[in-house]
Amino acid sequence: MDGAKSGKQCHVCQICGDGVGTAADGELFTACDVCGFPVCRPCYEYERKDGSQACPQCKTKYKRHKGSPPILGDESDDVDADDASDVNYPTSGNQDHKHKIAERMLTWRMNSGRNDDIVHSKYDSGEIGHPKYDSGEIPRIYIPSLTHSQISGEIPGASPDHMMSPVGNIGRRGHPFPYVNHSPNPSREFSGSLGNVAWKERVDGWKMKDKGAIPMANGTSIAPSEGRGVGDIDASTDYNMEDALLNDETRQPLSRKVPISSSRINPYRMVIVLRLIVLCIFLHYRITNPVRNAYPLWLLSVICEIWFALSWILDQFPKWSPINRETYLDRLALRYDREGEPSQLAPVDIFVSTVDPMKEPPLVTANTVLSILAVDYPVDKVSCYVSDDGAAMLTFDALAETSEFARKWVPFCKKYSIEPRAPEWYFAQKIDYLKDKVQASFVKDRRAMKREYEEFKVRVNALVAKAQKVPEEGWIMQDGTPWPGNNTRDHPGMIQVFLGHSGGLDTEGNELPRLVYVSREKRPGFQHHKKAGAMNALVRVSAVLTNGQYLLNLDCDHYINNSKALREAMCFLMDPNLGRRVCYVQFPQRFDGIDRNDRYANRNTVFFDINLRGLDGLQGPVYVGTGCVFNRTALYGYEPPIKQKRPGYFSSLCGGRKKTKKSKEKSTEKKKSHKHVDSSVPVFNLEDIEEGIEGSGFDDEKSLLMSQMSLEKRFGQSSVFVASTLMEYGGVPQSATPESLLKEAIHVISCGYEDKSDWGTEIGWIYGSVTEDILTGFKMHARGWRSIYCMPKRPAFKGSAPINLSDRLNQVLRWALGSVEILFSRHCPIWYGYGGRLKFLERFAYINTTIYPLTSIPLLLYCILPAICLLTGKFIIPEISNFASIWFISLFLSIFATGILEMRWSGVGIDEWWRNEQFWVIGGISAHLFAVFQGLLKVLAGIDTSFTVTSKASDEEGDFAELYMFKWTTLLIPPTTILIINLVGVVAGISYAINSGYQSWGPLFGKLFFAFWVIVHLYPFLKGLMGRQNRTPTIVVVWAILLASIFSLLWVRIDPFTTRVTGPDTQKCGINC
């Protein structure tokens, strides 16, 4: 019965409540071809003639259907009403069905989410809210700060007047305690909705005018003026030219692609093709012309060159069609955030992860949190979750101090629109801070705020100093109870809400975004999956407490540098034509505190400004681990809406035949049968959730229970969380109480929650590699999602990078080990996901991302070859003719031309490009090499490698003191050895040439060039070994002496100074020989 009712929703006009009716061809009338929002013919005609001319739901301009009179602004081809949308957007009936299931699963009697039955009743009563984020449609339960035994700031639900009144503040020095597993006992329920009667009045007025009368304000009606044409605009309507221009602007796209100009990209592509041809000819020459007296060296070099060619192809061709993108924040504001109206922007949950406060200073994390709380976004749409995977009381106390300082910092940022909104970096700027500031009070307020921040730093640093010495009995909280996280490997889950709608106001009486501390449960014997497990715990907690439609994840040292960063992302995610197919929006990583020359290529500009822009022209950039805004639906393992193919050229010329109902059903069945072509790419469709229920209706409790069990098997044993996954536009159940939500939040971060579920395999951050970001993005792309690369003029986020050589190499080692783990796993892009929706060149990029550490082996051999050639007097290339030399010269010219043209279209400087080339060699013969062997040990022998968190401590000993600090690590051994070998080889080669005469200098130049190529690439490494005072550390001196001794013995064995002249045997020739 209810299933039939859900199907009938599409037959009822959502404006006036009348039947939708049929079109001229006898089928159901569809006003909007994009979203299918049910509107009857009279309402459609009224909207086109006297209204906004756009769909009330998706804001798409209405096309003229057959039989409709033309109006001003109609396009010449707007007469075909049969054009289908590119995307199968869900209809209102389907959405209603999903939310009914969600509510029934939770309480069997709930009304929440975007329920079209409720919407219909609102229309009947003259109250219509926004279909997505209106407060009456998708309620957002506000969890107050939770203490150890009670809920502070409880909001009674007896009267609507008290719904939003915050009660009780956290004292300045009296820090709250986290909720562990104590059940508070409040009960409250939110109700109410926002709406207006504008649509109802306008539609009623149009109908009365159509009958010959115009309604007046007092309810009476008058006859229309005689002689007025049907197409004239009535003077009584509120439609005017300004509204027309405004509505036209809201229908414009929120972003657009900006292709690279043909004058820059076409020469680049031509050189790539020419380089590929030259490379093939060069390899053919090398293979067919062996060196007879140095066959092993020749064979080794040819194998290395073939591998380099393959690696170049995998890296180069995904950059074939790079693009830029532009966003239009003014259009976003016109469509979703008009001044004086409730904001309709989507809610966003922001995740910040930290582990060790000794290596990730609390002050750094505090600056990140403060920049989030001060972001330019509606406060009721932002929630910040801080994951403390180390369960440190220091982090908890520092977060409490941060929440207090935020009450002063946030209003200061918003009052004067300062950038950036991380106080440490704002006050450290060496700029004219009075520029563009017209308020007379700014200087005074800025001075006072700087003083407040210095006091805040003193308090936080005092906490850090106190935490250096851990008491024998463990840390004690202010109420005398032991800190639950004293044992970091065995502690319960903890949640504390510091800020929010009932957690106190700022100094100007405004609400602050929600700030939540989360530490997931840890017990011995359970696999916790490091950062990926912590992120999945945050996904579940946020779904239970706030359920924002989108998620932003940041490392604790990456602060928001552009306060409009979330709005930039919403220009893609909330775009009606693009957003539903986007799994995430990735921002480039930018860094502070890097030396001017960027000695170790920390900025990684080539990757962020060239490679990722190239991928954006395909299926989108890879996920790089931070600065990424996710679509929550994509993280839940669902597939994107299916994009239908447009009719072909000949069918459009001949006129496409309209599909009958039978043919439509047939094609639908065909699509369903071919939907899961490859069993290795599991994809879930939102429509699959209703399986077993649609046929029997909601009265069949058994079918509903079976569906709930299947969902709990996938998402875990939490009815509240399962219900939240069905709410496509976010929000939490309206009838849920803070007590029940808190219990569920504690439950979903328990260490055994993920057992026998799809978490980490198909849902959330994917397990199986220390670089969980690559796996997570790859799974989404394999399901058919696309990602977006957003590069605003002002960098969205900035972070810190390890400028010390040893720390930098350890960071690269971790990334490379993750790639090796993926290479030997079932998720390897070489064989995973065929038959899915991953584009061919996108697969190329992922293959390159996983196999690049293997390049370290041929690179190491190729760097040793120059020294061997110089010491033995042999070479890897035979004596070449003038014709053969053309191909060598052509290859070198094509390599340089590719780099130059790449820098030309991307804007990357030659110094950045060269630093990237140098560190490719340094990292390749050190970190990548170790990663290959450690990965093989882990896969074959099960020997796991533990990694320490990269230190993010601030530089307190002077500018770039960390850069010159020498930290010994085994990763330094291979580059040091290769450097010494080549230097010895150069000396030996020159000595041999001096003693052998003029004719030996010709072949020597090729060998010396080869050796200097290696030494020049290792020059930053050599500077790193020398330190600030250009004094080589003792350990390096010892290694140099040891290696020099080895090669001295080798030198004596070869003895290049001995004259090697062969002649006749004197015993055979005699004295007259």
From Swiss-Prot:
Binding residues annotated for UDP-alpha-D-glucose, in chain numbering: S353, K359, E360, D389, K530
GO molecular function: cellulose synthase (UDP-forming) activity; cellulose synthase activity; zinc ion binding
UniProt zinc finger (RING-type) residues: 13-59
Keyword match Metal-binding: yes
GO BP annotations, alphabetical order: cell wall organization; cellulose biosynthetic process; plant-type primary cell wall biogenesis
Recorded catalytic activity of this chain's protein: [(1->4)-beta-D-glucosyl](n) + UDP-alpha-D-glucose = [(1->4)-beta-D-glucosyl](n+1) + UDP + H(+)
Cofactor(s) essential for the protein: Mn(2+); Zn(2+)
Coiled coil residues, start to end: 443-470
Annotated Gene Ontology cellular component terms: plasma membrane
Extracellular side: 292-293, 878-882, 940-969, 1023-1031
UniProt keyword terms in alphabetical order: Cell membrane, Cell wall biogenesis/degradation, Cellulose biosynthesis, Coiled coil, Glycosyltransferase, Manganese, Membrane, Metal-binding, Transferase, Transmembrane, Transmembrane helix, Zinc, Zinc-finger
Cytoplasmic side of membrane: 1-270, 315-856, 904-918, 991-1001, 1053-1073
Active site residues per record: D389, D773
Ligand binding (Zn(2+) 1): C13, C16, C40, C43
Subcellular location: Cell membrane
Documented EC number(s): 2.4.1.12
Catalytic class of the enzyme: transferase
Domain of life: Eukaryota
CDD domains: mRING-HC-C4C4_CesA
Region (Disordered): 66-98, 655-676
Function recorded in the entry: Probable catalytic subunit of cellulose synthase terminal complexes ('rosettes'), required for beta-1,4-glucan microfibril crystallization, a major mechanism of the cell wall formation.
Assigned protein family: Belongs to the glycosyltransferase 2 family. Plant cellulose synthase subfamily.
Protein name as annotated: Probable cellulose synthase A catalytic subunit 2 [UDP-forming]
Organism: Oryza sativa subsp. japonica
Lineage: Eukaryota, Viridiplantae, Streptophyta, Embryophyta, Tracheophyta
